[in-house]
Swiss-Prot record:
Any Gene Ontology CC annotation: anaphase-promoting complex
One of the GO BP terms on file: anaphase-promoting complex-dependent catabolic process
Native source organism of the sequence: Mus musculus (Mouse)
Name the record gives this protein: Cell division cycle protein 16 homolog
Subunit record text: V-shaped homodimer. The mammalian APC/C is composed at least of 14 distinct subunits ANAPC1, ANAPC2, CDC27/APC3, ANAPC4, ANAPC5, CDC16/APC6, ANAPC7, CDC23/APC8, ANAPC10, ANAPC11, CDC26/APC12, ANAPC13, ANAPC15 and ANAPC16 that assemble into a complex of at least 19 chains with a combined molecular mass of around 1.2 MDa; APC/C interacts with FZR1 and FBXO5. Interacts with PPP5C and CDC20. Interacts with CDC26. Interacts with FBXO43.
Amino acid sequence: MNLEPLRKRVRQYLDQQQYQSALFWADKVASLSHEEPQDVYWLAQCLYLTAQYHRAAHALRSRKLDKLYEACRYLAARCHYAAKEHQQALDILDMEEPINRRLFEKYLKDDNGSRDPSSDWEMSQSSIKSSICLLRGKIYDALDNRTLATYSYKEALKLDVYCFEAFDLLTSHHMLTAQEEKELLDSLPLNKLCAEEQELLRFVFENKLKKYNKPSETVIPESVDGLQENLDVVVSLAERHYYNCDFKMCYKLTSTVMEKDPFHANCLPVHIGTLVELNKANELFYLSHKLVDLYPSNPVSWFAVGCYYLMVGHKNEHARRYLSKATTLEKTYGPAWIAYGHSFAVESEHDQAMAAYFTAAQLMKGCHLPMLYIGLEYGLTNNSKLAERFFGQALSIAPEDPFVIHEVGVVAFQNGEWKTAEKWFLDALEKIKAIGNEVTVDKWEPLLNNLGHVCRKLKKYAEALDYHRQALVLIPQNASTYSAIGYIHSLMGNFENAVDYFHTALGLRRDDTFSVTMLGHCIEMYIGDSEAYIGADIKDKLKCYDFDVHTMKTLKNIISPPWDFRDFEVEKQNTEEAGLAPLQNSTKAPESRPNLEETFEIEMNESDMMLETSMSDHST
């Protein structure tokens, strides 16, 4: 009986996804052919596609086909991998080649010339070997051995340069640094294995690799003209905009992709991250619910839900629950680990946040975000040395990221290196301005305030005021910005303006210790300058409508009693250590006081005026 028509019918049913029909006829063909290896292989394929993994593996291994044929060995291992029996799958792949297999292949070669034992199965040896390396990499990934997983993926790609899955696992999971990605691309034998499509492969690989490069118009080689509108190419461009902090352009591109393909797998994480950055809570809510309804077993669905609860605030427990579900579905899903760390960081749970970030750093060696957030947590726990080290690592991966540059400037400020801090802050500001010519996103407000702080330290009071006023444009109701402006006015001797700004700051935040203390000092100094005339105008300025003249004259002693000489010396030492000159003793005669146009000397520690380190907000 000629079995070829039945074999073709089995393939036809497989192509039509009628797996039960294919299984029925594959079983009959295997019996009719007296269990020819090829027919048993296709029977096992049908069993695998109907999720009968142990039956499929038994069909191959009971006949010792996994020891004779690479394709059967690969399929048997894949069955155990699908059943989550990772060690058994690895044992099959790493099985030593038996002597009888080598004799069998020699016999085939002698009998049929140079016939490949797998040629009848329409599979090349290099393709099967590449598939084995790919599967081995996935198993190592599941066993948390990232080093061997990376090596296996590289080998799979070198054996078969068309094996995009291996390339995608290396790049989308950030398993390689930028330098390692470049070395991998240069090591691929494109000339040997794909002379005709060499230009196409080089373009698609390079387009996916350059995520930290400055986004520019995609240059398509003439031989592959027509890829401009390809969604994968557009997503790669959007990713470059995302990593260069141009979130508006990134959102525009990802929205275009989502209109054409609403569930584009590569686009979804970038689109979700952009929605978080632009604070589009309603859109993220709608998208996350749609994803959970349609793809409940996909980690990106629960990642989207977790990001939504993180964004709305005060829902961190809910966020952790859904992000934990995402990491359970795929424990190598780095973005979910980063967001999981954010849910602890916003509650100042630094140890738990860092544990999540360290997990993300192990999974995403080529991504700068885990390093950035680890450094941020170390900075918040006053460990500036370790913070500087991790920021340095983040900067080596993403040298153009203004968030990282800003945090390096914060560390320099905390170390008292004012000039260095100013350089880093200005560099970050230039990078931001290059994105959209002007600073408009409110997340850059801490950078402007920090520029104001460092300019104040360098006695550039006019510039400092300008930066703080720019910060007020972005976030108008920030008490710390008003107190910073008031502080600069007090340093310049403009006590009337200083009092106004400190009052405004206290109106926004009544428990602001710094503003309360400084308001007392400024009122004291202002009255000292105005003793010649205390009238309704002065009382109005000081918001002291119920005070009589005697109270106004003695307000200094009520607010801050005179210090004795010994106390003054101690305070002077503290302020000098903080980089500030002390306030002159208020009992001195007015003529002995320095010119108010010079530095205003304040008798208090400036530690209450905290530098803002929150520009790197907890985004994806």
